[in-house]
UniProtKB/Swiss-Prot annotation:
Organism for this UniProt entry: Listeria innocua serovar 6a (strain ATCC BAA-680 / CLIP 11262)
Domain of life (superkingdom): Bacteria
Cystine residue pairs: 239-241, 272-275
Gene (name only): hslO
PTM comment: Under oxidizing conditions two disulfide bonds are formed involving the reactive cysteines. Under reducing conditions zinc is bound to the reactive cysteines and the protein is inactive.
CDD domains given in the database record: Hsp33
Chief site of localization: cytoplasm
One GO term (biological process): protein refolding
Name listed for the protein in its UniProt record: 33 kDa chaperonin
Record Pfam families: HSP33
Amino acid sequence: MSDYLVKALAYDGMARVYAAVTTETIKEAQRRHDTWSVSSAALGRTMTGTLFLGAMQKEDQKITVKIEGDGPIGPIVADSNAQGQIRGYVTNPHVHFSELNEAGKLDVRRGVGTSGMLSVVKDLGFGENFTGQTPIVSGEIGEDFTYYLATSEQINSSVGVGVLVNPDDTIEAAGGFMLQLLPGATDEIIDEIEKNLSTLPTVSRMIEAGETPETILAKLAGGEDKLQILEKIPVAFECNCSKERFGSAIISLGKEEIRSMIEEDHGAEAECHFCRNTYDFSEEELEKLYEEAK
């Protein structure tokens, strides 16, 4: 099944709810970055959370999320847009712990760390950026996104993200949900939401069992009849890197640096952090870039 995200309203229009299955997308990220179990879970959770923030944006806007904890994984970066395109990378892809956490799951908190920052940069188009930053509160990722939304954007939310990793480090299931209270939600609605959240199985297990974004939202809303589906968006790992972009980056290094590449290295190889694609530049190509540089 292809990955997709569903947007809906629930609780008499008093809550905005999103759910997504991202299994194939996170499989692609795992394959490209050769991530081990804990790194896979952390990257997959971050990418799914970023996907939800991207889905909140207008058509030409983009979101970049960076989680910088004090754990061995190092910084995690993901970006997404309103079209469901998502990419990401983790600084140390090879983190695995033989011990599980107290809940019997991969110890993502230990990998990410419990001290650090979650930063969100919104590219609003026209050269305008908005940056929000909150401290890491748990290192489990979902709770950190929840805290960011409540603190930086003043939106009471609940974000649940999960990745089920097989013993051979391949991805079995991935996805998540996001619920946001809208102005006017009553105490009764809040109580009902809390009750439904408390009985919700873990996201990765629901997806492993074959649940879809629609059925996850129905569980979240307390019944399919209580949902108003608004939109369904395809989700995929997409990277917009290109040789032209890397050429522009090389030009920005300046003539001296490019001359060094030509005379000492006799060429250059650039690798995209997000997708691991590599681009080779010959001496002749570098000479052309040298002419364009200042």
